[in-house]
Amino acid sequence: MKFFCQFGGLLSAILLSSTLATAQPAPVKTAAKAVFTLTTFKADGSLLSSSHGVFIDANGTAISDWSSFDGASSAVVVDATGKKMNVTCIVGANEIYDVAKFIVDGKTASAPVATSGLAEGSTAYLLGYAVKKAEITEARIDKVEQFMDKYSYYIIKQEMPGNTQSCPLVNVAGQVIGFLQHSQYTTDNHATDALYVAEMTTSGLSANDPVLRRTGIPTAIPDDEQQAKLALMIAGQGADSLKASKVINLFMQKFPDLPDGYYLLAQNAMIGNDFDMASKQMETAIKKATAKDDAHFTYAKLIYQKEVYKSDIPYPAWSLDKAYEEAQKAYEAEPLPFYQHLQAQILYTKKEYQQAYDLFMALTKTNLRNPELFYEAAQSKKMLNAPQTEILTLLDSAMSVLPQPLTTEAAPYLIARARQLEEMGEYRKAIADYNRYDTLMVGRHNAEFFYQREQCEVKGKLFQQALNDINLATRMAPQEPLYHAEKSSLLLRLNMKQEALEAAETSLSLDPEYSEAYLLKGVAQIQLGNKKEGLLNLEKAQQLGNEQAPALIEKYK
C-alpha cells in the first residue's frame, strides 16, 4: 500500500510536470525560435566570450549583454536552426546594466519586445537555447524596480538552469521583457528591461562613446544622412584603421549613392600613394551618386589635397587644372558658392593671385561671406605686393564679420592682423591683438606664441612684458636653445649681465654649435669684465658663420 502511494505520488509529479510543459502558451514557444548563442573573439582570433541573446526583429536586430563585446574584435551568432551569422555593428550599449543592442547580417526569427513591464508576482518564461527544442522555465518576478522613469529592472530569486546567461525572459504573449543576468554578489538573478535596450539608437557622435570604443566591432551608421556623415568623419579620424574600414563599408551599404564613403577609401588609397585606386574610387562615386555636384566637388578636394601635400610624387592624370575642372563641374551641376571657394583656393595655389583675389572678393558678396574669405583675399594681395594698408583693410574686414563677443573662431584672424600690424611698425596695436588672442586662447598657448609676442614687445619697447613672455617661453619649451638665446639678448638690453651670461650658457648646453649663443655669451663676458674669454667666444661665433661677430670683435678688441 505504501509502495502504491509513493508510486502514485511520483506519477502525479510526472503528470504535473508534463502538464506544465504542454501548458506553455504557443507565443512563448514561438519566441523560443528567436534565441541564439553569441560568441565573441579577440583580434588574434582566439575565443573571448560565449553568451546568448534574442532577435527582436526580422532584420537581424538583437539584444544581449555588453560584457561579451568588451575587447572583442569580431562576433558570430548561431540561431535556433543552427545558422551562423556575423555581427556587423553595435547600435548601443550600457556598461552599468551590462546590455547591448547590435545587428547581424541576415534575416532572423524574432520575438517582439514588450512595451509594458510585468508586476511583482507575475510569471515570466525563461527561454533556453536549443537547435531542436528549447528548455522553457517558468520564473516568478519577485521584485520590480523602476529606472529612468519608465523602464523596469526585475529581480528573480529562484534558481535558474545553468548556461542561460543572457537568455530572454518573455511574458505570456511571447514578448521579451528582458534577459537573464546572474548577480555577481548574491544568488539572485536580474533582468534589465528589454525595451530600454531596444530603444537604443546611434547618432553621429556614438563612435566617441567611451564604452563603444572598447570594442573592435563598429558602431552602427545612423539613419539620418547628416548624422551618418558625422559618424563617418569621426571614424576616418580614429586610430583604429580596421574599425574605420568597417564603418566605411557600413556607410556605403546604407548610403550607396553618397560619395563620402568612396572619398574616404580614396583618401586612404592616396595616403598609401595608390593614386590609381583613389581615382577609381572617385570615378565610381561620380557614377553612382545622385547628387553629381557633391561627387565632383569631393573629387576636386581629393586632387587638390594631393597636389598640395604630395606634389613631389608625379601622377599625370591629376593636376591643379584637373581639380579646378572637377570643382567647375560641381558648380555647373549646382551653383553653390563653396564650390567656387575651392576654385579660388586652387587659383591661389597655382599662383594666379589676381584671379584668386577677384573670386575671393566676389564670394564675400554671397551668403558664404565669412572671415576666411577676407583673410584669403588679404593673402592674395600680399602675394601681389599690394600696399600694406590694403592688406590691413582686408584683415579688418575679416574681424568685422566675426560674431560678437569674439570666440576662439577669431583666434587665427587676430594673429594674422597682429603680424600685419607688426610688419607695418604698429607695434602697440599689434600687441593689443596678441593680447586679445591670449585672452581667447587662455591655457591653450604654446611657447612659440609667447616668443612671437615677446619679439613684438621688444620692438615696441615694452621690455618688462617682453621679459615675462620670454620667461614663459623658456619654461614651456626648456629644450629650445633659441628661446634661451633670445632671453640672453633681452637681458643684455636690460643691463642684467650675469643673468644674460647664464641664459647664453643654457642655450649652448642645448646646442653647442649655436653661433648666436656664443655671440651673446661673449658680449656678456666682456661687459662683466672678462674681455679675454669674451673675445674667444666672439671668435667662435665668427667661425660658426655669425655675421655680427666681426663687427663686435673689432669693437671690443
Where are these regions (language model features)?
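Canonical tetratricopeptide repeat
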Residues: L264, T298, L342, E376, ...
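Flexible, gly/ser-rich surface segments that form the specificity/activation loops bordering the active-site cleft
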Residues: Q24-P27, A109-Y153, M160-T164, L180-A191
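C-terminal cap/linker of serine protease catalytic domains
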Residues: P25-V28, G178-K243
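Single-residue signature of alpha-solenoid repeat helices
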Residues: A244, A278, A323, A356, ...
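Helix-start (N-cap) detector for alpha-helical repeat units in TPR-like alpha-solenoids
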Residues: P259-D260, A291-F297, P335-Q340, N370-E372, ...
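Conserved active-site neighborhood of the chymotrypsin/trypsin-like protease fold
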Residues: D57-L127, K132-I136, K150-Y153
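A conserved glycine-rich beta-strand in the N-terminal activation segment of trypsin-fold
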Residues: Q24, F41-D65, K84-N86, S166-C167
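Register position in tetratricopeptide repeats
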Residues: I271, Q305-Y309, T349, M383-L384, ...
